[in-house]
């Protein structure tokens, strides 16, 4: 694989007015990805062989803060600023319940988001615990519009898809 996915996101304009596409080559990326800009498009080369994987829970996080703000747990985290982002062609896997505490099924999000107009398609979204895909846009701002298609959602707990919105 190439350089870090996070480094590519950081090189994107702060407020892109059109989609900013980041192509991710096949390989295993053991890194947390934080999207804090709108219009970011992550495109994996091969859904089954472009894998972003970490092991974390709310209590045991790789990163607590990013750019001075608290960051939620999850392999990919979309902050409030990450509206209109697309994730496609990836396997996103939180394997905490396999490698750190076997059998533990507490919340182990693969993708967590607070952004609006999030599109996740043609991807595997896996977690060893509850809430593999959890998008929670701010309801008071009218947020919560999501589109999902052609997903393989897996979790060993409950709520493989835990949305708030429409």
Residue map of PLM features:
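Well-ordered beta-strand segments characteristic of repetitive beta-sheet solenoids
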Residues: 22, 41-45, 88-89, 123-125
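Acidic glycine-/aspartate-rich tracts in secreted/extracellular proteins
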Residues: 27-28, 46-48
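Right-handed parallel beta-helix
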Residues: 78-166
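Extracellular beta-strand-rich solenoid/capping regions of secreted or surface-exposed proteins
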Residues: 10-15, 30-41, 52-86, 96-116
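General structural concept
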Residues: 20, 29-30
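Short, small-residue-rich loop/turn micro-motifs
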Residues: 46, 56, 91
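Extended hydrophobic secondary-structure segments that form protein cores and membrane-embedded regions
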Residues: 22-24, 110-111
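Acidic Gly/Asp/Thr-rich repetitive segments characteristic of extracellular carbohydrate-active
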Residues: 1-23
